[in-house]
Each structure stands twice: as structure tokens, then as C-alpha cells.
Amino acid sequence: MPEAKPGLQLELLELLLVGAGAVPGALLRWQLALYLGDQNLLVNVLGAALLGFLSGLPAAPRRQLLLGIGFCGSVTTFSSWMLAAVKHLSAGDWAAALGLIGLTLGLGLGAAALGFNLGRRLKPPEPPQSPT
């Protein structure tokens, strides 16, 4: 991840990378919703796995901007997930709301951990530190 900058000062390349990842992510999300219906669970779990994988790879700030923040950030959706839970709650279906929240959290955490560990396996081993 790039180092935080004061205020909202951004580099043009950083903006372009995030936008270049966000557009296909949002379009994919839209198409998945059209063809699969409301599949927040599937999309969020797959997005968590991909983001975990990317984060487990050797550091590459530009890749993280493009694919992590841009693509994964726009293909996954926290707000739609919460709205689905609220709809269950407003219908009086507490079990479905809590089940959706618990299932998404559990599967999402597991998917992120799996992706992260897979990404770390591709990372070259660190050279041993010599005692000084």
C-alpha cells in the first residue's frame, strides 16, 4: 500500500490505477447481479479470497491499487450485504439476517485467509538474518 499522504493529495497514476481496476470490477458486479441475481455472499467471498491472495504476494503498491482497492473494492459490496440483512430484519426474519451475517463473515474470513496463505506460498523465502 502506498504511504499515506497529507490531505487528499493524490498522484495521477494512483487515481488512474484505482479507476482502471474499479471500472471492470463494477461492471462485473453489475453483470453478476443481472445473471445470478442477488449473490452478495458469492461475490463477497470470492472478492475476499482474491484480496487475501493479492495481499499475500510480495508487496507491489501499483498492483494493490489496481486490483486490491480498485477491482476488489468495486466488485465486492458491504452496503448491499448490510441492506440484505436489514431487509430480513424488517421482515421479522432475525434468523435469516443473523445467518447471512454469520455465514458471510465466516466464509469471507476463511476465504481471505486461504487466499493470503496461497499468495504467501508464491513469495520467495526471506534470506536468513545473520547474527550481529
Curated annotation (Swiss-Prot):
Na(+) binds at residues 73, 76. Na(+) is not transported, but it plays an essential structural role and its presence is essential for fluoride channel function. Pfam families: CRCB (PF02537). It comes from the Bacteria. Keywords: Cell inner membrane, Cell membrane, Ion channel, Ion transport, Membrane, Metal-binding, Sodium, Transmembrane, Transmembrane helix, Transport. It comes from Synechococcus sp. (strain CC9605). GO terms for cellular component: plasma membrane. PANTHER family: FLUORIDE EXPORT PROTEIN 1-RELATED (PTHR28259:SF1). The keyword Ion transport applies. It is found in: Cell inner membrane. The chain crosses the membrane at residues 8-28, 41-61, 66-86, 96-116. It catalyses: fluoride(in) = fluoride(out). Belongs to the fluoride channel Fluc/FEX (TC 1.A.43) family. InterPro entries: FluC. Fluoride-specific ion channel. Important for reducing fluoride concentration in the cell, thus reducing its toxicity. One of its GO terms (molecular function) is fluoride channel activity. This is Fluoride-specific ion channel FluC 2. It is a multi-pass membrane protein.
